[in-house]
Structure formats: structure tokens, C-alpha cells
Amino acid sequence: MTKVYPLLAFFALANIAHAQDNPYSPEAKLTSDSAKTWNVGVGFTQKLLHLNAEWVNPYGIAYAKAGVFYNDDYNAGAQVGFRYPYYLTGKDKNGYYVGVYAGHIESKHINNEYEARLGAGVDLAYVLLSKERISSFSIGIGAGEKMTDQYGEVIAETEPMLQFSYTLSVGI
């Protein structure tokens, strides 16, 4: 009899069905007529001058940025991220978007050359979205990797840092 109880409990739990009414599921706020699905453009993020590609989907905007840091060495940098429309303010899908990003956040002079520093963070953006273009202003807070020189001296600590960004993209 004691061997039957675990088996009964297993079958009772295995037959429970959960409906898809999770209150934390994201809401699809963007429609296909909000903007073109694919957009390309230019912008700057901190000291990174970049080209960017953006994918508009019902749940937000995914983006990839690739460019160079404008320092003496012009080393390459890239970022990827996603922004979810949190609060929309107009008939177009203009409004406040919250997002996450990861990639190169700054360039540091280490061992007589510049090195790109990896990091990640969250941001708040105001996005002007129309069928023809996407323009976004964002401020983010994130942290980068700890960087040391060849002697083990710490050049950059892992600590919070602000990131400012502006991009302008047009639909393709």
C-alpha cells in the first residue's frame, strides 16, 4: 500500500493543466502597420559611432549596433539589445520603452593600446516610431568587466555607469 501512494500522487500531479493566463506575459503592443519590420540607420552610443539594424516585432524592437570608438585607435565595438514598449504616448507608437543591452560599452587605454570593454545593462528610451523611421533617445545604467593591465593594476572596476545613446533608422 505504501508503494501505491507515491504513484497516485504522481498521476494526480501529472494530470493538472495550467492555462496560459500568466499575468506577467508581455502584451503585443506593436502592429505590422506601426513601422517597417526591418530598419537600418546610424547613431552614437557613448563614444561608439555605429551603424545599426533594428527589427520591429509585436513585442518590441530588437537591435544590433556595430561601429568604432572615436579615440586614437578607432577600435571596433558592437552591442545588441531589446526594447519593450512600456508606455505609448501618441497615435504613432511613440513612447517610453524599457530595454536591456549587452556588448562593448567603452574603450580604455591599456598597455599602450585601446581595448573595448564588455558590459551589459538596462535602459529607458523615448522612441519616435513611424512607418518611415525610428528615432530613439536612451539613457541606461550598466556595468562593464573589470580590466587590468599587464602588471595586474586595475584600470577599470566593475561599477555602475551611465550610457547615453541616439539612433536614427529608416525602413527598408
Predicted regions and their residues:
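Outer-membrane beta-barrel proteins
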Residues: 57-59, 83-91, 125-130, 168-172
